[in-house]
UniProtKB/Swiss-Prot annotation:
It comes from Xenopus laevis (African clawed frog). This is Gastrula zinc finger protein XlCGF51.1A. A zinc finger (C2H2-type) spans 6-28, 34-56, 62-84, 90-112, 122-144, 150-172. It comes from the Eukaryota. May be involved in transcriptional regulation. It is found in: Nucleus. Coiled coil: none annotated. The keyword Repeat applies. Belongs to the krueppel C2H2-type zinc-finger protein family. PROSITE patterns: ZINC_FINGER_C2H2_1, ZINC_FINGER_C2H2_2. Keywords: DNA-binding, Metal-binding, Nucleus, Repeat, Transcription, Transcription regulation, Zinc, Zinc-finger. GO terms for cellular component: nucleus. InterPro entries: Znf_C2H2_sf, Znf_C2H2_type.
Length: 172
């Protein structure tokens, strides 16, 4: 959702994670931050500033050997190369879903965190199916409109046809 609950008390910058706020706070604590002359963005290291400044000049010295696409930052090349290898190094400890990019993974984890912090159930009350986002649950609920559910008395799972319910109940 792009929620950024952690804010800097010095400048008001907002962050998704407390660790990013702590890293940002070094800019204020060290007293001598490095500032981009193009946009005024502050950095704590010379290498981070140099990598950032490439984005203004259009310089892209890192190229992919598979497709020759070029990148301003080495890390962006490394992430891109995963599209060729199929590597998905970021794994959700809650549901097991795997991700190629850290940004995708972080966004996904926010869904689980939001569910825990809000105490909100993202389970369909009609059939019990679980969802990681409120919008997916809302769309799913529409699939039940106009249906009279046949519900298992043991587990609450619903079925469209009596034969499906009977078959399911044999499992219990």
């Amino acid at each position: 959702t792009g929620e950024k609950p952690f804010s800097c008390s010095d400048c008001g910058a907002r962050f998704t994670y407390r660790s990013l706020l702590r890293r940002h706070n070094k800019i204020h604590a060290e007293g001598k931050s490095l500032i981009c002359s193009e946009c005024g963005k502050p950095f704590t290291s010379e290498s981070a500033l140099t990598a950032h400044q490439r984005s203004h000049g259009g310089e892209k010295p890192f190229s992919c050997t598979d497709c020759e696409k070029c990148f301003a930052q080495r890390m962006h090349l490394i992430e891109h190369q995963r599209t060729h290898t199929g590597e998905k190094p970021f794994s959700c400890t809650v549901c097991g879903e795997m991700f190629t990019y850290r940004a995708q993974f972080s966004k996904h984890m926010l869904k689980h965190k939001r569910k825990r912090t809000e105490g909100e159930s993202l389970d369909c009350s009609h059939c019990g199916k679980h969802f990681t986002s409120r919008s997916d649950l809302t769309v799913h609920r529409k699939s039940h409109k106009g249906k009279s559910p046949l519900q298992c008395s043991d587990c609450g799972k619903c079925f469209k046809y009596q034969s499906q319910l009977a078959s399911h109940q044999r499992v219990h």
